[in-house]
Curated annotation (Swiss-Prot):
Lineage summary: Eukaryota, Metazoa, Chordata, Craniata, Vertebrata
PROSITE patterns xrefs: KRAB, ZINC_FINGER_C2H2_1, ZINC_FINGER_C2H2_2
InterPro entries: KRAB, KRAB_dom_sf, Znf_C2H2_sf, Znf_C2H2_type
Source organism per UniProt: Homo sapiens
Identification of the protein by name: Zinc finger protein 552
Residue ranges covered by zinc fingers (C2H2-type): 91-113, 119-141, 212-234, 244-262, 268-290, 296-318, 324-346, 352-374, 380-402
Amino acid sequence: MAAAALRFPVQGTVTFEDVAVKFTQEEWNLLSEAQRCLYRDVTLENLALMSSLGCWCGVEDEAAPSKQSIYIQRETQVRTPMAGVSPKKAHPCEMCGPILGDILHVADHQGTHHKQKLHRCEAWGNKLYDSGNFHQHQNEHIGEKPYRGSVEEALFAKRCKLHVSGESSVFSESGKDFLLRSGLLQQEATHTGKSNSKTECVSLFHGGKSHYSCGGCMKHFSTKDILSQHERLLPTEEPSVWCECGKSSSKYDSFSNHQGVHTREKPYTCGICGKLFNSKSHLLVHQRIHTGEKPYECEVCQKFFRHKYHLIAHQRVHTGERPYECSDCGKSFTHSSTFRVHKRVHTGQKPYECSECGKSFAESSSLTKHRRVHTGEKPYGCSECEKKFRQISSLRHHQRVHKRKGL
């Protein structure tokens, strides 16, 4: 079996005819059903690729095929390859027509004319398969994730949505049968003149916008198949618990962690220092103080940090970025926490109040230092003379005395 060689023009635009393989009647009769199916798939995918690249071979000034312009209509009786098919109805142009006409002959494979039952693949939306190929196709999904990549999305022949009356391969209103597996049919629009969402080809191929929205999160998707895949990842159950602040969660452990914000409950205890936390994640981060773990490294100076947000703030030292600017005085800051404290200079706000004497402070660290006046706590001890101090600044000042003596 010899196929005609591909012809590539030296100059000019490549047309669909240039990349298509043509068969004579004798050669076509020698092809098996599997070979004809393969020929059909390859030809349709080539057509999709040519159209997506703008290499459409239609009439001059004619736009590339849109989601309402490409369809293949097939009469009930079997035609011979390369037979004359009306170019106005059966194919986009006279050059593609004879080639696409060959594809119509695949319609009689595996008992299509016997109106055998077709099956829908749940993972691939409305794509239809006969009984034998359906089971073979289902095996392809075993051990793989159902999401399909963008390259596959671009294959027009694999993504056209069909509207079928029942599960028969014959469209009941016209009495004409269609090549369901080709993926290039428009049935309902042919009879009603209207375009149904189920007959629209994927908007990604045609450069359209996302028309399918998720009712749960309002995200938009280019195809209904992708939307279906997204919806499978959403929680299938209603939120089991609601908080007084309006937040909800379908997971009880997440809700319990959130509740700790309101109840001040701290059920997680550090086994080393006894400090309490309202969530397990906060406890794990705290334990890095005891273990010395610093998993976040600066690529510029190789410094390590316990928290990711500390690394992000540190990197602004290298970039010079100061994203937080005071609208009152024009000062800018690298840290949001420093900026918040600075704003209190202008507002006079002092939210931290001492319960012993009623004195207020703008920073929590200032209140902590002040409390030591009442408690008598002196946590900073000198390693040379064992003197203790309430503030670390006082300790550093004292240590200079020992350095001078050592000189």
